[in-house]
Amino acid sequence: MQACADPRLWAKRRLMPLNAFQNTFAGNPLDRASDRRKDAAWLAERLASDQSLGMVLWNGKALVERSSSGGMQIAYLPSRLVEDLSGGPERLLFMGLWQDTAVFAVDLEGPADPTDGPLQGMGRFEDARALAASLPSGEIAIVGTAKGVFEWRRKHRRCSVCGEATHPTEGGWKRECSSCSAEHFPRTDPVVIMLAVHGDRCMLGRQEIWPAGMFSALAGFLEPGETIEEACARELFEEAGLRATSVRYHSTQPWPFPNSLMIGLIAEVDGDEAQPDQTELSEVRWYTRAEARALLAGEIKGSFAPGGMAIAHQLIRAWAEEA
C-alpha cells in the first residue's frame, strides 16, 4: 500500500558509515533531530501534517509490505493514522527526519493482529530478526531503533526512584515521574563480544541452551568500573580460563533484543588450553582460518556459526579472511 508520499531516498542516497564496516541494525539514515524533541508544538504540527510518515510496531513486530522490486520495505502510513492508532502519546515515538519529512512510530500491543482490523490490507507484521535478511539495511536500522526504544518504555512505566507512574516526553525519548519528577532515558547495555585467537586458530564456544551444533564468539556484559579491554579479558578468563594478551577493536552493533550495544573485539590469548566453565560454556573448539571459512559456509557437518546478521559472524569472517 502506498498510503502517502514516501521518499525512500536512502535506497539511492545512503549516509556513509563512520566505520568502514557496518553491522545489521546500524546505519539508521534518519536525522534524529534531537533538538526538536522538546518542541511540543512543532511535534504536534508535524504529526498532523499530510507530509509526515508513520510506521507501526505490534508486539515488537514491524508492519512491512512488498516493494515494487519484489523485496520487503517498511509500510509507511499517514502519520495522522498512526496518531489515531496510538490513542495518545504513551505509544508514540518521534523517529526523526528524512530531509524535511517527519517520521513517527506507534507501539501497539495485544493478542489481536491489527492487520485483521484497522490495518487490513496495509501489509503484514514480521519479526525484526526475520526482517534483518529481507529489509534494506537502512530500514532494518530504523526498525531496530524503534523496537529498542519501545522495549525500554514498556519496562519503565514506573519510576525506579519512587515507584509511581511515569509519562513520555520529548517525542517519546524521555519518561518523567508524575510524582517525584525523576527523569528516565533509554537504556543501552554494553556487551563485549570477542573472538579469541592464538596463532593461526580461533576459539568458538557453545552454550547448552543454543541450537544443537551452534558455535559462536564469547560475550558478556561490561561491568561498572571496567574498560572494554578489561571486560574482554575478564570474560575470557571466567568462561574459558584463557588470558588475553592484546585486544583490538573491530566494530559495534546495536542489538535491540532488548537494548544492547555489542562491542566486537578480536583478542589474542596466551595459549590454547581452554577450560569451559560448564556454566556459561559447555564446550569450546578451535578452528584454523580455512576451517572457520568452512564453518561460515555451512560446510562442516553438525556445526554452524551465527548468521550474517550477527556481529559474531562478522568477527569470525574478518579474522578468517585476514592475509
Show the residue positions of the predicted features.
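Generic recognition of flexible, low-complexity loop/linker segments
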Residues: 251-253, 296
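A short, glycine/Asx- and small/polar-enriched loop/turn
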Residues: 257-263
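N-terminal strand-loop-strand
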Residues: 175-217, 221, 243-244, 267-269
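Short proline/glycine-enriched turn/loop segments at secondary-structure junctions
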Residues: 253-255, 275-277
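The catalytic Nudix box helix
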Residues: 217-251, 265, 271-273
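Nudix hydrolase/Nudix homology domain
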Residues: 3-156, 167-168, 211-215, 277-323
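Cys/His-rich short segments
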Residues: 145-195
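Solvent-exposed residues in well-ordered beta-strands and their adjoining turns
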Residues: 268-270, 287-288
